[in-house]
Amino acid sequence: MMFQITKSKLRFPLSTFTKRYSSFQAAKSVIDKAAIDGELRVFIVSGEVSGDNIGSRLMSSLKKLSPLPIRFNGVGGSLMCKKGLNSLFPMEDLAVMGVWELLPHLYKFRVKLKETIDAAVKFKPHVVVTVDSKGFSFRLLKELRARYKQQRLENCSVHFHYVAPSFWAWKGGESRLGGLSEFVDHLFCILPNEERVCREHGVEATFVGHPVLEDASEFDLVRRCKPQELKLEGLSFSEHSIPSDSTVISVLPGSRLQEVERMLPIFSKAMKLLKDPFPKLVTLIHVASNNQVDHYIGESFSEWPVPAILVPSGSTQLKYDAFGASQAALCTSGTVAVELQLAHLPSLVAYRAHFLTELLIRYKAKIPYISLPNILLDSPIIPEALFQACNPSNLASILERLLLDEKMRERQVVGAEKLIQLLHPSESRMGNSIHCTGLESHRYTPSILAASTILSYARR
């Protein structure tokens, strides 16, 4: 699908583009090479829900900044498809996490990898962008680069990877960074200090800020929504026959089918234990944008032990409104832990995996926490229930304290303010990028910074 950027759609003067384009020609940038073909071709791949969100926003920002029409191809979810991507296959086919959990899916994984490589070569992209999902992404980029050399293709596409691997979390992680430069031209880092470490190991990188910061710029995150004001499935709480003085907990079991299958039964048993201390307990079960997850939760819904309402995917504001109507949250470890902090909603992070994967994590991990807020603040601001500690009795006990202990709740709110500052790149770190785009600094989101870097990139 072709996207034409006209003068009327530009958020800043066309003269800005003319000036930028002249400098790009001299530097033989991505946009200069694309100009020869009269369009910018971007092959973009995401393998999970959080990556679909990042990818869709990057696509929007590229269309906003590019002086050329853009054509997209690759793999993504519903959000990326809404921006014009015709996904090669369902993104859920790649949503597998863990070493041992991957084994049953290896054949399908290899088939999808070959299909993606063949499609990328046929598409002849100027830019390849992979988003997170490093297992699939790095194999794709590595084999693509090998294919270029094998076919002696000149002026091959530039490779970007969005979300640097968590090298800081694993023993020996930094030592493996150097090898990335063989198939990744530029990394987009979402955490402070990652850019510096990547560059020290020979990998070009830019700290663009954490993707959830875009939620803060677009939505009202900390609005305290009274339960009776919240509309879910088209109905208010009262229309769902739920009292306005209910104790409301948001439950977020994950975005991948394998983790939801593992976590939801544990969460269900924990809610059953909370029925006695909180007789008016109600849960808001957040459903990820994943058809397999949607189906599984739908089938499990009838066995849920307390009154519950499903919060569908597709509306970020609805998600944050549901957070605002809740007194606490129980979530599987992931990006959502940061989203809950932005919403100032006290939460408990839980995680279980295959026992062999858990053993590997214990052996290889060099940090004591699993949730990003705790890692960045180097403090257990958010309680974590991991591995064997992730059992119904312990989850119920921690949630009860979280609902009743004001000091425990306040600690998370204070920590959230510190976290937001850490996740945002300072104006000085952005260098001249703000001036290159013509955007005011307060509108310089992570995806805009990434898009600007892609368009102005010139391989050394």
Curated annotation (Swiss-Prot):
Organism name: Arabidopsis thaliana (Mouse-ear cress)
One MF term in the entry's GO annotations: lipid-A-disaccharide synthase activity
Annotated localization: Mitochondrion
Cellular compartments per GO CC: membrane; mitochondrion
Predominant location: mitochondrion
Any one Pfam family match given in the protein's UniProt record, by short name: LpxB
Name recorded for this polypeptide: Probable lipid-A-disaccharide synthase, mitochondrial
Catalytic activity: a lipid X + a UDP-2-N,3-O-bis[(3R)-3-hydroxyacyl]-alpha-D-glucosamine = a lipid A disaccharide + UDP + H(+)
